Structure formats: structure tokens, C-alpha cells
Swiss-Prot record:
Name of this protein: Large ribosomal subunit protein bL9
Organism: Halothermothrix orenii (strain H 168 / OCM 544 / DSM 9562)
Cellular component per GO, a single term: ribonucleoprotein complex
Top-level lineage group: Bacteria
Cysteine disulfide partners in this protein: none
Sequence similarity: Belongs to the bacterial ribosomal protein bL9 family.
One Pfam entry name: Ribosomal_L9_C
Function (record text): Binds to the 23S rRNA.
Single GO MF descriptor: rRNA binding
């Protein structure tokens, strides 16, 4: 019997897979526990429709991320901090500070997506990569100036 998996099942497949199993396994275990449904023409058509919608939403998110990345790369973000002699900062500029500055400019970025190797500890201009969505990366221009 062919079934469509509703959830991931160990040693059988992932959600959405169409697999062949014995009739007893399907009727007595998979279907009653809500792990699968019988693979009828209607159910398979419905599954394909859901996959198309999911792919369309995914493409839309990628497009939005690319649009946001291009907007972010055009802007220059200024962070004002106190500094001592020779342009050394009191403290440092962290991913949290960068995320807050970007948020003030009207963009929402998670601080964990900012790829800062080491905290910024001196005045100057820096290029900081940010992972927007999957493989969409924007490079922010951060200028650290004295307050």
C-alpha cells in the first residue's frame, strides 16, 4: 500500500514522502497514529499543490531578502561611542549595538545573523557581513565615530 507521510518516520521517510509499506503496517500503525494517510489520487494532487505553494512562498522570501540586502548595502550606519587616546574605544561595539543601529534605521536584523569576527575596538569604517536569509548575504558599512 502506498501512503503519504504526515510526519517524519524513522527508517521510512520524511514528511510529504510517498512510500510503499505493507497493508497491515499502514492500517494498524501509521494511519491510526496520524503518521500517514493513504496515497489516493486526490491526496497526491493535494500534496503537489501544497508543495507548489510552499515553493512559491520560499521564492518570495528569497526575493524579499535580496531586496532588503540591496537596500542595506546602499546605506551607511553610524555608531557613536566614547573613545580615549589613539581612537581606542571605552568598551567595544558588539553585534547587539550594530543590530540596534540598523533597527533605528528601519530594518529588522537578528544580532545572531551578524558575522562579526571580533568586537570593534577602534574608531573607523568597517564592512560587516550579515546573513539575511539562507544564502542571501549583505555587507553593512559601519562607521564608528567619537560621541
Amino acid at each position: 500500500m502506498k501512503v503519504i507521510l504526515k510526519k517524519d518516520v524513522k527508517k521510512l521517510g520524511k514528511k510529504g514522502d510517498v512510500v510503499s509499506v505493507s497493508d497491515g503496517y499502514a492500517r494498524n500503525y501509521l494511519i491510526p497514529r496520524g503518521l500517514a494517510e493513504e496515497a489516493t489520487r486526490g491526496n497526491i494532487t493535494q500534496l503537489k499543490e501544497k508543495e507548489k505553494i510552499k515553493e512559491k512562498k520560499h521564492q518570495q522570501k528569497i526575493e524579499e531578502a535580496r531586496d532588503m540586502a540591496s537596500k542595506l548595502e546602499k546605506e551607511k550606519f553610524v555608531i557613536k561611542v566614547k573613545s580615549g587616546e589613539n581612537g581606542r574605544l571605552f568598551g567595544s561595539v558588539t553585534t547587539k549595538d550594530i543590530a540596534e543601529t540598523v533597527k533605528k534605521a528601519g530594518y529588522k536584523i537578528d544580532k545572531r545573523k551578524i558575522d562579526l569576527d571580533d568586537n570593534i575596538k577602534a574608531l573607523g569604517t568597517y564592512r560587516v557581513p550579515v546573513k539575511i536569509f539562507e544564502d542571501v548575504v549583505a555587507t553593512l558599512k559601519i562607521q564608528v565615530v567619537e560621541a
